[in-house]
């Protein structure tokens, strides 16, 4: 029935064999086909870029995205899952620019947009085979063949429909606005994309500039940290209610206006200036000043070069006076609301000054800072220069500084649907739950209109055609609509193709498409519709698969994909796009830094899998903080520990069962005997049925952390309690009912455990299942149903009893270890103290287990600790402080004088009065801190309500028994080293040392039983292995397989 389990196991090799079994037998396909007609469980897979290889950051969500669909499939749902590729956008363009050795918008246009886009198309799926190989090797089941790509015409057409639907609802508009802008990419970014990048600490020049008040010999001292914006200065801002001082600078012989609170920053000596006048900012509002540069003098008639009041001005730094240019959102709004100035932006697409600013023409704006400063010096307008350290946003694609600039862009009106977004969020089950009201909820509350246009090339074009004569706009929502209006056949919706499509306007002009493409986040947010070509295909079935039952990605997607899914789902259908989401954290290198190929600070993921196995890696990841959206400092040693402490123990339990099942010719059946008499069998069966119940509840709630904790706790119970305590039942030669029950129980438990573990570690569970399954069972473990609890087999009372006993044993073993008393050395007495009568009853019922586990001869169960300890006491200052007040110091000395008898009375609830300065105080147990002092030869430990004591006095008889146990261990090791089978009987050879004679004479029967020895023989010639029984006690032994 069962195949023998090899003693040496190579888990990666097993996994490769299982992978071949799945592929050859199309097990994944069968898992979906067998659920045809069942309720569908909808899962959306966020599309990655295929321009880079998968890394640990991908492994976490891909593991989660495999666990849940496998589980739901085993729960009877049909879970279709398709891989997707994000094929448009800046990452692809950036890669092509590098390969073509070109950079920037102008060079791309010179190269040719059509040729550039063709290069993008060529590289966009560069690593798809590597992705498929890696993700499959991780054990994830997903359909790669029927994948979707955002560059597919069907996908792009659905995105046009999404855009048109929002446009027709009035939720999309075009406007001029200050936006974060990537000079290297020559395109604006959305605010949430800024948050996907990194804020770095950088030093910028901090300048204080002199602005001359018109027609007066007085200067405003204005502050800026962006010198490059000074050529476009159009105004100055002060705080309406801020106090300002007009001063005369004695050294410079000039008059300045400055925020009063900032005087001491600029003048260390108050005698260096004279205060002429003080006033509020409101007083100088509207005053005109002379521009420091003459590039835009024509703006004076439109309201430029005046003082404005603004709430954002402070005196925390600078001068309390700031210069205004249309390169900041607040500045832009002041100019827009208070002047009629043109929104001058004399910089090109790559943020180089144009010929409007002749002195700095062709310079990148940040590179112009020093030249501008030199110019100011030469004009005697630079009052002070310092350096300013501050956090500044960098582009998440190019890692270069962003520039804020006014630019025309298309927006989704988030403000109009904000309340609906918040309502949609209420419908989502977040795991971890704090994200709902925390990171994601707060992001929604503060969400701003979404800039969705990009001045780029390889993307989904914004489907708006504008009349060249009137500016009338037509928004297109399908290929058919575009063909009807233009009279041209449309096969490809990319920019280089549709930009050539024009048609005459009824107003006399020509309809030409607006030049921008869509933010690729708009496309990924459209994935639920576009991947299904909605509404052009299967429209009636769509609402059966929307919203998704489940999605999973990293924490950064709270401001990325989760956000755009929520926006578009709410805007289109007033519904969330997903019901449940598991969010993972970031995987860092072991030193806490970001994983980096250049730093080589992490192991290649495939090397990890080929060394330890995918199951070990999967389990390591889902056991870690990363599953709770916290960061994980990855280490190979962590995966190695999972292999050693979890995977191998599971294998050992399975190997133990198979070994004895083969020996005893055990024939399994899938029914469990409901009338078992052995308490261990009853307990472990109850435990696994309880585990089934818990796992079904917790995984249904998407709580993988709790699920894993429960599984690991059970594996420990199985190996370190049930199997260890049941070994002799398998060892005995006769096949009595107890042995049969042990086989049946272990078979049932291991098989059910594999079924429960299958979604988490699919390879190992498949390997074990293939050897355990009967002929009439499913071809693969993953085609089975997930185990459901048999309620009548659950015995909570028995579980609580056994857990209490395990706790007592654990505490006692820890006590032995802390005093270096090896478990093989027997002790005379163990004391267990508890006041709980139920616990005392359990101890009496199961004292034989405790004695065996602790290796003690006698157990004494007590209600108090009097026989074990003597007490001393210290004052509990926190409690006594309010009671004793000024008498606290004397009171603490009185408490230190309490006798053992005094303390016992307090423990037992009796009054104990102390008298201090004519005042009396009743001292209770909470007023003192107990100190336990062990009585002679006793070792004591206290945990919660239980105190354990061990009698550490070792008699000669106990000492010899301990040595006999040590001898047994040495013989067992020798059996393993010689590759003896567990059922092999042996002859044991020993030398003629006195100590060995004593041990074998007194414990011969015990030694024979434990080591399957049929004969012990004194034979120096054959006892050749030197072993240490105890400190400095060396003996020689040998073994030989028994043959009749």
From Swiss-Prot:
UniProt keyword terms in alphabetical order: Aminoacyl-tRNA synthetase, ATP-binding, Cytoplasm, Ligase, Metal-binding, Nucleotide-binding, Protein biosynthesis, Zinc
Any one of the GO BP annotations: isoleucyl-tRNA aminoacylation
Pfam families tied to this protein: Anticodon_1, DUF5915, tRNA-synt_1
UniProt motif ('KMSKS' region) ranges: 594-598
Main location: cytoplasm
Placement of sequence motif 'HIGH' region: 48-58
EC number: 6.1.1.5
Annotated InterPro entries: aa-tRNA-synth_Ia (IPR002300), Anticodon_Ile_ABEc (IPR033709), Ile-tRNA-ligase (IPR002301), Ile-tRNA-ligase_type2 (IPR023586), M/V/L/I-tRNA-synth_anticd-bd (IPR013155), Rossmann-like_a/b/a_fold (IPR014729), tRNAsynth_Ia_anticodon-bd (IPR009080), Val/Leu/Ile-tRNA-synth_edit (IPR009008)
Domain of life where this protein originates: Bacteria
Reaction equation(s) it catalyzes: tRNA(Ile) + L-isoleucine + ATP = L-isoleucyl-tRNA(Ile) + AMP + diphosphate
Cofactor(s) needed: Zn(2+)
Oligomer and partners: Monomer.
HAMAP family, per the entry: Ile_tRNA_synth_type2 (MF_02003)
Function: Catalyzes the attachment of isoleucine to tRNA(Ile). As IleRS can inadvertently accommodate and process structurally similar amino acids such as valine, to avoid such errors it has two additional distinct tRNA(Ile)-dependent editing activities. One activity is designated as 'pretransfer' editing and involves the hydrolysis of activated Val-AMP. The other activity is designated 'posttransfer' editing and involves deacylation of mischarged Val-tRNA(Ile).
Family under the similarity heading: Belongs to the class-I aminoacyl-tRNA synthetase family. IleS type 2 subfamily.
Entry protein name: Isoleucine--tRNA ligase
Species name: Borrelia turicatae (strain 91E135)
